[in-house]
Amino acid sequence: TTVAMTGGSGAPDMAAVISAMPDEWYNHIMMPFNDTTSLNTLRDELLERWGPLKMSEAIAYTAFRGTYGETITFGEGRNDFLISCIGTSKSPSPIWEWAASYCGIAAYHLAIDPARPLQTLVLPGILAPAKADRFAFDERNNLLKSGIATHQIQPGDVVAIEREISMYQLN
């Protein structure tokens, strides 16, 4: 049985992180933290960069680990069109590895063809959740309605993107 790590002491100051990337143009940003303060700080920076004065649009990728109910609640608490969050269920891989794999695969393939759908692309290095912890089809559909991107498990316990969406839900 794998248990969650303990002993951490929160997320870093995202304002300091953002100040270190002055006017560099990053199309894809991997966000290893999904606490409200960190996501709001990054969201505000992305909105400023997206605006008419800078026009250096980008999207951030993050992940959320939790039960179906916890993941729905997290998704419904956000409304960010420049952040995409993939639900991990209870995968043994940590969320920062999910976010890195998700961002890396999306960035690579979208640079080749920005209109390419990302479904079925394998997330390298990611371990599948136990069968009892995997989201069912109807649960994954509800996650999408709550602004959470979904994954599927292919034969051999290979994890792949099922549907990539942003966390934007309400206009």
Model-derived features: positions:
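Polar low-complexity, Ser/Thr/Gly/Ala/Asp/Asn-rich disordered segments used for subunit assembly
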Residues: 1-96
